[in-house]
């Protein structure tokens, strides 16, 4: 699929909105998949958290669909990758791995890059799309926080060091790199200490 580009031209902004909409659509499926696949073995509050996440992601997708319509496009108008869903398939039998890879790596990456996208859209004069992306960014902090909280719950339940276990799972299940710069304030707000991910990024860069 085409790479996401900076939001300069109308075509680039449409492509970027489409790419984010695709991520949000996958995130809807992932939120409900984690409930259906793992909810029975977890406390009821786990299901409550991910139902709320799924509701948020559906609203995000709807908002992005409206913005795509406003720029004479629609979801499905462009090719899309399956990387996020591939991660779901790879972690389909391991809840800890699912939490480590999807919310704590992939969604946390959104916290790193979305503020720049907001600035790009504002700079291009598309304040409506910028506001949608800002809303998504602010609400995604809670989604990363839910993943981090439940990962730490599993670590405590299994008497494991959460930081070490997270790094082991990322090395095993994640095929990409943890790219700097990190949005450390947003990640910290989501309950992710720098010691979880920054040494891991350096290790992956060295491979």
Predicted regions span which residues?
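Non-heme di-metal
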Residues: 1-207
């Amino acid at each position: 699929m085409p790479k996401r580009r900076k939001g300069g031209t109308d075509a680039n902004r449409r492509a970027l909105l489409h790419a984010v909409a695709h991520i949000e659509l996958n995130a809807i499926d992932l939120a409900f998949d984690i409930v259906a696949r793992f909810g029975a073995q977890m406390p009821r509050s786990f299901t409550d958290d991910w139902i709320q996440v799924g509701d948020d992601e559906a609203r995000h997708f709807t908002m992005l669909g409206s913005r795509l319509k406003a720029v004479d496009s629609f979801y499905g108008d462009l090719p899309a990758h399956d990387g996020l869903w591939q991660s779901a398939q790879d972690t389909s039998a391991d809840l800890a791995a699912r939490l480590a890879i999807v919310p704590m790596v992939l969604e946390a990456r959104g916290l790193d890059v979305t503020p720049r996208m907001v600035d790009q859209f504002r700079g291009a004069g598309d304040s409506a799309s910028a506001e949608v992306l800002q809303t998504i960014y602010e609400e995604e902090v809670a989604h990363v926080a839910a993943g981090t909280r439940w990962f730490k719950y599993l670590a405590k339940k299994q008497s494991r060091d959460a930081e070490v276990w997270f790094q082991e799972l990322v090395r095993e299940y994640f095929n990409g790199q943890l790219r700097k710069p990190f949005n450390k304030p947003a990640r910290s707000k989501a309950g992710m200490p720098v010691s979880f991910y920054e040494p891991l990024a350096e290790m992956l860069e060295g491979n």
